[in-house]
Amino acid sequence: MVRYRMRSPSEGQHQGPGQDHEREEQGQGQELSPERVEDYGRTERGHHHRHRRCKRLHRIHKRRRSCRRRRRHSCRHRRRHRRGCRRSRRRRSCRCRKCRWHYY
């Protein structure tokens, strides 16, 4: 994901003296120009400021959706390495670390 940065009002004042006067005239109109809309935290298409998730939180969220809850498919690790007899230990559908720890 990409982190977008909002423009602060002080940042917009680094332009030349002729452009400051032009921005004041634009602000008096009823419609917001794309530059003015950006100051409010949105672009003209309506996209909001996106927050990047913390890696730790993302990892915890992924951990909750473990392969044990999926009934039809085993995890990617199991599909890649199909070793051993499938008939033995039928309760365990997956050989990933989480499932091995759960059933031992």
Swiss-Prot record:
It is found in: Nucleus; Chromosome. Belongs to the protamine P2 family. Protamines substitute for histones in the chromatin of sperm during the haploid phase of spermatogenesis. They compact sperm DNA into a highly condensed, stable and inactive complex. Testis. Disulfide bonds: none annotated. GO terms for biological process: chromosome condensation; nucleus organization; spermatid development; spermatogenesis. It comes from the Eukaryota. The modification Phosphoserine is found at residues 8, 10, 33. This is Protamine-2. Interacts with TDRP. Residues 33-44 have a biased composition (Basic and acidic residues). The gene is Prm2. GO terms for cellular component: male germ cell nucleus; nucleosome; nucleus. Its main location: nucleus. Residues 1-91 are annotated as: Disordered. GO terms for molecular function: cadmium ion binding; DNA binding; zinc ion binding. Proteolytic processing into mature chains is required for histone eviction during spermatogenesis. Transition proteins (TNP1 and TNP2) are required for processing. Keywords: Chromosome, Developmental protein, Differentiation, DNA condensation, DNA-binding, Nucleosome core, Nucleus, Phosphoprotein, Spermatogenesis. Residues 45-91 have a biased composition (Basic residues). It comes from Rattus norvegicus (Rat).
